[in-house]
């Protein structure tokens, strides 16, 4: 995990957030998936930086990019 993305069990139900905020990584990803640009995300969350958006994407990539292990038949 990057310094920009943190998990605190006492904030936002323990979901990943941008450090120092209550903005969930999922909120940023939902906006991007819905067609918003990085610039539009930053307009909606003016206290974020472009690096926070990129860190959210990197976090999502790390979460889905894992080795697939198959059990022997």
Regions inferred by a protein language model and the residue ranges of each:
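Conserved phosphate-binding loops in nucleotide/dinucleotide-binding enzymes
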Residues: 17
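Basic, low-complexity segments
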Residues: 1-13
């Amino acid at each position: 995990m990057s310094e920009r993305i943190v998990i605190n069990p006492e904030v936002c139900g323990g979901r990943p957030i941008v450090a120092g905020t209550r903005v969930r990584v999922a909120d940023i990803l939902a906006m991007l998936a819905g067609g918003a640009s990085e610039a539009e995300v930053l307009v909606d969350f003016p206290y974020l930086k472009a690096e926070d958006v990129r860190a959210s994407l990197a976090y999502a990539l790390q979460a889905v990019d894992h080795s697939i292990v198959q059990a022997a038949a």
